């Protein structure tokens, strides 16, 4: 039963790491990356549809994204969604494909994005600590219900803390890597 608590916590830590990785992938770093468009929803025949389901997204050059709609009639809807997004990039529509030229980041923009990365990292750490709290509470419940002894509780709390420390260390590493990517010219 005690192992189940740790396994559940570790699974939730992994989910937090994956979520953070997706979040970091959507923060542009001056290079074209198809994952920048993962969160873009296009109003396609009245239904919000992910852009990657309506078009193929390729990276022909280091700072260019090429969006080729499967249905050419949806090109205006895609362009409208890109203009409405918070990307800050103006799409160039040539009738059959849309080009997004990723501008080089200014020093000021890089620093702003680095702050955003830190903020997102801190939010992920809070999530990890909440998972730890839930696991600790579950362990204490089991001890109260006499399912585990007090010594087992102490050992379990130690294991939970160790897993938490590893999860936080991974978040710190991911954050440092993303900051380095942003601040390198």
UniProtKB/Swiss-Prot annotation:
It comes from Streptococcus equi subsp. zooepidemicus (strain MGCS10565). Keywords: Cytoplasm, Protein biosynthesis. Responsible for the release of ribosomes from messenger RNA at the termination of protein biosynthesis. May increase the efficiency of translation by recycling ribosomes from one round of translation to another. It comes from the Bacteria. The keyword Protein biosynthesis applies. GO terms for biological process: translational termination. It is found in: Cytoplasm. The keyword Transmembrane does not apply. GO terms for cellular component: cytoplasm. This is Ribosome-recycling factor. Belongs to the RRF family. Pfam families: RRF (PF01765). GO terms for molecular function: ribosomal large subunit binding.
